[in-house]
Amino acid sequence: METHKHERSTFSGKLGFVLSAAGASVGLGNIWRFPYLAAKYGGGIFLLIYIILALTFGYSMIVAETALGRMTQKSPVGAFGKFGKSKWLSFGGWINAIIPILIVPYYSVIGGWVIKYLVEYVKGNTQNLATDGYFSEFISNGVSTEICFLVFALFTVGIIYAGVRNGVERVSKFMMPILVFLSIVITIYSVTRPGALEGVKYFLIPNPKNFSWMTVVAAMGQMFYSLSIAMGILVTFGSYMKTDVSIESSTTNVEIFDTAIAIMAGLMIIPAVFAFSGGDPDTLQAGPALMFITIPKVFASMGLGTPIGILFFVLVLCAALTSSIALTESAVSTFQDELKWCRQKSTLVVGAIMIVLGRLSSLGYGPLACVKIIGMQFLDFFDFLTNSVMMPIAAIATCLLISRVIGLKKVEDEVVLGEGTFKRKKIFNFMIKYLCPIFAAIILLSSVANAFGWISM
C-alpha cells in the first residue's frame, strides 16, 4: 500500500488538527442535544455512562477514523476504495461520504434559527422570545427562516472556499477560544443562581434509581453527535494530518475538549432550568424544544436575561459554525478526490446542494408542512435518516474495514507515528473488533424501532 505520496492540503500542526476536530465535535450536539438528553435520562447516571463510553467507544472510533484518513490520504470513498473494489467497501466509503452532504443542509437551518434568536436578543426582545408560540410561529414563517438559513449557509461556504489553513483552521483557532471562554462565563453564572444547586446535584451525582436501558442507548447515540463519529469528518481531517503529529495524543485532546464542553453545557442549562422550574420533570424533559422554548423563558426570568441570552447564543452560533464548516469540508473533499474537481468548483457545488436540500428543511414547518415522509417533516426525516440509520451503518463498515480488511496491526503502526506510543492499544483493539460494531447495531435497531413506534425512547 502506498501512503503519504501525493500533495494534499494539511493542517499546520497538532494544534490546527485538534482545534479543527474539536470544533467539528463541539457543535449543536454538545450545546443543544447533550443537556436535554442528560435532563431526560437521569442526569448524573447519564453523564457517568456517557463518560465511560467516551473513553472507550468514542475514543476507539476517533482513532480509527483519523488513522484511516492519514494512512490513505483520502476522504472516505477513496479511503475505503484503497483496500479493494468490492461492493461492500464501495458502499462503506460512499455512506460515510454522503452523510455530511445530507446533514449540513438541515444543520444550517438550525444554525439560522440560532442567528434569529441572537439578533432578537441583541435587539432587546427578551420577553418576546419567551412568549408561548414564538418559536413555532417563527419556523412556520417561510421568508424569515429562509433568510436566516441562507446567511448561515453562505457564511459556511465562504469559509470553506478559502481553504483548509486559511479557512477551516483559521476560523477554528479564532472561534474555539471564544467558545471556551463563553462556556465558562455562562456556566459560572448559571450554577450560582438561587435554586441552581439542586440542578447541579441532579446533573453531576449519579442516582442508580434513574438508570434504564434507554439511558445507555441514548448515551451511545449521543457519541455520534458529540464526537463527529461516522460522518466522514475525522477521515477527512485525518488525511490532512502530518505524519509527525501523534494520533493518540491529538485524539485524546479532542476527546477531553469535547467532553469538557458537553459537561459545561449541561451545567449551563440544567441548573438554570432547575432554578426556573423547581425541578419540574415536564420542564426537564422538554427535549429538543429546551434551547429554543424553555431557555428563553429561563433567561426572561433572570435579572441579566438579555446579556446572558446574547452570550449564550453567540456561544451556540460559534459551536454550530465550527461543526457546519467541518461537515461541509468533508463533503467538498469527497468531490475533490473522486471527481478531481478544484476546491472552488467543489465548494460551489456542495453549496448549491446545501441550499436546495436546506430549503426543504427550512420550509418544512411552513409552506411545505403538509409534505411528510414516513410521518416526518423534512428536517426530522433527514435527521432520522442520517443519525439513526446511516451513521450506525457507517460505523459498522469502518470497524469491519479496519478489523477484517486492513488489519489492526497496520492501524497500530499508523497511530504510533509521531510520538511512537499507543497507550490504549488493548482497549482500541477490543472495541473495534467486538464492542463498537455491537454498539452501533444496537443504536441502529433501537432508533428504527423508536421511529416506527415499536419502543419509546
What does each model-identified segment do?
Residues 38-64, 144, 390-391:
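Extracellular loop-to-transmembrane helix junctions
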Residues 2-7, 11, 169, 173-321, ...:
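Membrane-embedded translocation segments of transport machinery
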Residues 10-21, 45-49, 87-101, 147-152, ...:
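Select transmembrane alpha-helical segments in multipass membrane proteins
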Residues 13-53, 249-252, 256-259, 290:
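Transmembrane helix-boundary motif of multi-pass solute transporters/channels
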Residues 2-4, 78, 111-140, 241-244, ...:
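Helix-loop-helix connectors at the membrane interface of multi-pass transporters/channels
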Residues 5-8, 37-41, 76-95, 108-165, ...:
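Inter-helical loop and helix-membrane interface segments of multi-pass membrane transporters/permeases
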